[in-house]
Amino acid sequence: MIDIQGIKEALPHRYPMLLVDRVLEVSEDTIVAIKNVTINEPFFNGHFPQYPVMPGVLIMEALAQTAGVLELSKPENKGKLVFYAGMDKVKFKKQVVPGDQLVMTATFVKRRGTIAVVEAKAEVDGKLAASGILTFAIGN
């Protein structure tokens, strides 16, 4: 398990863009983390005031940050950054609303030099909310 302090040590993101609250499981190539979605999220002010829904792009960002925690926690990547290089086969299956807990899983399936490919999914109450294949570049 990695708490919020460990997450902040790995990631450069801060409020309001830090979208990982806790890491539940971590192994060499897979990480499972959570994001507790509350009505206090700043994006709910405009998306949508009468029907708040977490923007899909922010779900994907939360998945990317989850993968980033795994990659940037490795000694050889300390102090580096992870940048999006692409997204593929992204699907949104369930709306994420205030009160939901996103359970995010990212598994690295390919690495070549500074490029990494991750299969990622976000679930709410055991149901798939979003999934996709994310490509990252690791840099200084």
Swiss-Prot record:
Pfam name, any one: FabA
Glycosyltransferase recorded as keyword: no
CDD domains: FabZ
Catalytic center residues: 47
Catalytic activity: a (3R)-hydroxyacyl-[ACP] = a (2E)-enoyl-[ACP] + H2O
Compartment list: Cytoplasm
Protein EC: 4.2.1.59
Keywords: Cytoplasm, Lipid A biosynthesis, Lipid biosynthesis, Lipid metabolism, Lyase
Any one GO molecular function term: (3R)-hydroxyacyl-[acyl-carrier-protein] dehydratase activity
Chief location: cytoplasm
Tagged with keyword Lipid biosynthesis: yes
Family annotation (InterPro entries): FabA_FabZ (IPR013114), FabZ (IPR010084), HotDog_dom_sf (IPR029069)
Biological process per Gene Ontology, one example term: fatty acid biosynthetic process
GO CC annotation: cytoplasm; membrane
Family: Belongs to the thioester dehydratase family. FabZ subfamily.
Protein role: Involved in unsaturated fatty acids biosynthesis. Catalyzes the dehydration of short chain beta-hydroxyacyl-ACPs and long chain saturated and unsaturated beta-hydroxyacyl-ACPs.
Name of this chain's protein: 3-hydroxyacyl-[acyl-carrier-protein] dehydratase FabZ
